[in-house]
Amino acid sequence: MNPAHLLVLLAVCVSLLGAANIPPQPLNLLQFKNMIQCAGSRLWVAYVKYGCYCGPGGTGTPLDQLDRCCQTHDHCYDNAKKFGNCIPYFKTYEYTCNKPDITCTDAKGSCGRTVCDCDRAAAICFAAAPYNLANFGIDKEKHCQ
């Protein structure tokens, strides 16, 4: 075999080994983002660091109605995990959007339908809740005990 071909093959193998250590990204977050846009007018990034429960993790008492939407969504995902093999952050699902109406179309009782229903309820809740800019990017250690 040509030495140049061996070098290319080696480079491909090394890059594949490196890629094997990259954790998979949550797949349904793109769907959830699109669902949020379907239900309301705020960009999804407005919710990433909002209050005590919006974004990763969550603790303490929700600061307002919007933060309660995120807490409820977290609890809904916790319930979805009881399906055994249901991992909400990685479970994709089918739905339709006819602004502002969202319809989940996976089979009732399935993991996908349950996760879709969680995301749908949260998106509708987000759209209905007032947004308090003072609750964005707060110090969670100070305000969320």
Curated annotation (Swiss-Prot):
PROSITE patterns associated with the record: PA2_ASP, PA2_HIS
Catalytic residues (UniProt): H73, D119
Propeptide: 20-27
InterPro entries: PLipase_A2 (IPR001211), PLipase_A2_Asp_AS (IPR033112), PLipase_A2_dom (IPR016090), PLipase_A2_dom_sf (IPR036444), PLipase_A2_His_AS (IPR033113)
Family: Belongs to the phospholipase A2 family. Group I subfamily. D49 sub-subfamily.
PANTHER family recorded: PHOSPHOLIPASE A2 (PTHR11716:SF94), PHOSPHOLIPASE A2 FAMILY MEMBER (PTHR11716)
GO biological process annotation, one example: positive regulation of fibroblast proliferation
Signal peptide range in chain numbering: 1-19
Transmembrane segments: none
Record-given protein name: Basic phospholipase A2 Vb-2
Highest rank taxon of the organism: Eukaryota
